[in-house]
A protein has these predicted regions:
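A polyanion-binding, active-site-adjacent surface
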Residues: 1-166
Length: 166
């Protein structure tokens, strides 16, 4: 029988009594041999979300996400469902960029509402970063962007630059 013995999760009020007024939570780094993903990753385009939904891409967000993905076309490739990978890091607490790089070897990466700091990447919201040879964007969640016309335009501008689309 599985029993969660972590005091801070079961009895958070007891933590203060045991530890005093200062409490430091340490985010332990974990290595995963496999991470569940959607897509074929042919063009090494990693998409990262962080939500408690059962599906990696919730049904309500699927249509908008695939419209964006299939709009990515340049002289090197035309993006499709086989061209990207999508993961939900909420199920992989403690995962770091080195682990993701090892498993997916991304050349392009978008954090959709998932804080890149969780995996050790420093990037501002609606900004970009370069990690090794991977171009990284950090934007709002798919749901937030799909409901806001200005954010859609802003996203498309960043995606065009990332993939060098004319």
């Amino acid at each position: 029988m599985y029993q969660n013995l972590i005091i801070s999760e079961n009895n958070p009020e007891q933590v203060n009594m045991l530890m005093g007024e200062e409490l430091y939570l340490v985010d332990e780094t974990l290595w995963f041999e496999e991470i569940k993903s959607e897509g074929g990753n042919k063009f090494r385009f990693l998409n990262i979300v962080d939500h408690g939904n059962e599906h990696i891409i919730p049904e309500s967000e699927r249509d908008f996400f695939f419209r964006i993905i299939t709009s990515i076309k340049n002289d090197k490739f035309t993006m499709d469902a086989d061209g990207f990978s999508m993961i939900n890091i909420s199920q992989y607490r403690g995962v770091k960029w080195k682990n993701l790089d090892h498993l997916f070897s991304p050349v392009y990466c978008i954090f959709w509402g998932a804080d890149p700091e969780k995996v050790g990447i420093h990037c501002k919201l609606w900004g970009g970063a370069l990690q090794g040879n991977c171009r990284i964007l950090y934007v709002d969640s798919i749901k937030e962007i799909s409901e806001n016309q200005e954010k859609k335009k802003q996203l498309w501008g960043l995606v065009k630059r990332m993939f060098q689309i004319q």
